[in-house]
């Protein structure tokens, strides 16, 4: 008996399986399904299996929600499925893969930039406070 997964895992003519994001939702309210699909199929078209979901807009608690079926993702990667760049980043943030070095570098740059902005803002308020004290006396 031939298993269905072996048929799906074999490279079909003209492409391979890819784990990627399929756009859903409506205008100004995106929602993504994480799917295993053939790379030649359209972004929102037919897929082999849905592996999770991703809501990029923060909820009332400021959280972006991601649901992943890591066992099935591991299965499809074992079958030879490729990952899209956004999925590599998402799985890196989830701890499934190591983070890309540029993500770490960008986070450090952003942290330094925000610290510098806070420092400049505090210096500006201190300077304004001393100016108002000098004019009052």
Curated annotation (Swiss-Prot):
Swiss-Prot/TrEMBL GO biological process terms: mitochondrial translation; translation
Subcellular location: Mitochondrion
Chief localisation class: mitochondrion
UniProt cross-references to Gene3D superfamilies, sorted A to Z: 3.30.1320.10
Top-level division of the source organism's lineage: Eukaryota
GO cellular component terms, A-Z: cytosol; mitochondrial inner membrane; mitochondrial small ribosomal subunit; mitochondrion
Molecular function terms, GO-annotated: structural constituent of ribosome
Disulfide bridge map: none
Transit peptide, residues from-to: 1-34
Mitochondrion is among the record's keywords: yes
NCBIfam families, per database record: S16 (TIGR00002)
Subunit annotation: Component of the mitochondrial small ribosomal subunit (mt-SSU). Mature mammalian 55S mitochondrial ribosomes consist of a small (28S) and a large (39S) subunit. The 28S small subunit contains a 12S ribosomal RNA (12S mt-rRNA) and 30 different proteins. The 39S large subunit contains a 16S rRNA (16S mt-rRNA), a copy of mitochondrial valine transfer RNA (mt-tRNA(Val)), which plays an integral structural role, and 52 different proteins. bS16m has a zinc binding site.
Pathology linked to this chain's protein: Combined oxidative phosphorylation deficiency 2: A mitochondrial disease resulting in fatal neonatal metabolic acidosis with agenesis of the corpus callosum.
Protein name: Small ribosomal subunit protein bS16m
Gene of this entry: MRPS16
């Amino acid at each position: 008996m031939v298993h269905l997964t072996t048929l799906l895992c074999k490279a079909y003519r003209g492409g391979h399986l890819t784990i990627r994001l399929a756009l859903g939702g409506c205008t100004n309210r995106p929602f993504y399904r994480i799917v295993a699909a053939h790379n030649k199929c359209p972004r929102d078209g037919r897929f082999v299996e849905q592996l999770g979901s991703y809501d990029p807009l923060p909820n009332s608690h400021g959280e972006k929600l991601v649901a992943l079926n890591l066992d099935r993702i591991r299965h499809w990667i074992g079958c030879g499925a490729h990952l899209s760049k956004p999925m590599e980043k998402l799985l890196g943030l989830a701890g499934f893969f190591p983070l890309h070095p540029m993500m770490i570098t960008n986070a450090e740059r952003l942290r330094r930039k925000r610290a510098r902005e806070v420092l400049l803002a505090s210096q500006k308020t201190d300077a304004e406070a001393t100016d108002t004290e000098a004019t009052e006396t």
